[in-house]
Amino acid sequence: MSLAPIALFVFARPQHTRRTIEALMRCPEFADSELYVFADGARSPSDVPAVSEVREIVGELLGDRARLKCATYNLGLARSIIQGVGDLCEKYGKVIVVEDDLVVAPRFLEFLNGALERYGDDDRVMQISAHMYPIEELEPQNRALFLPFTTSWGWATW
């Protein structure tokens, strides 16, 4: 299976970013995945210290392991994601998307990479979501299902 690149979007939350990266590192597929970190710019001068600290944490934990793309001004989350996901889909044909406040399970990358491969030719699927709202009737089934909406807490697309 060809692994999708990971797009990690970070801003000004140093401890969240640290926990997110540490959780990703516990996924076995992480070591063989391409990683792009999109670091948004400060909204105001008061954001600069936290934005700088986030970038330092990325360097400390990942070193040259990640391709760090630092915005010089604040793009905002939506624009940053649209640009980053678009660029990576154009280059690789698929992408796994993580924001800086997610703590993923060790099988997160396995699930999303497998689903990208399994559903890649299925026109009904536009996105694979790693998060599922707690619906009591579905919990015992613990399986993937088709839903008419998306979630943004860890996802993948083509």
PLM regions with names:
Residues 1-97, 102-157:
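An acidic/histidine-cluster motif and surrounding catalytic segment
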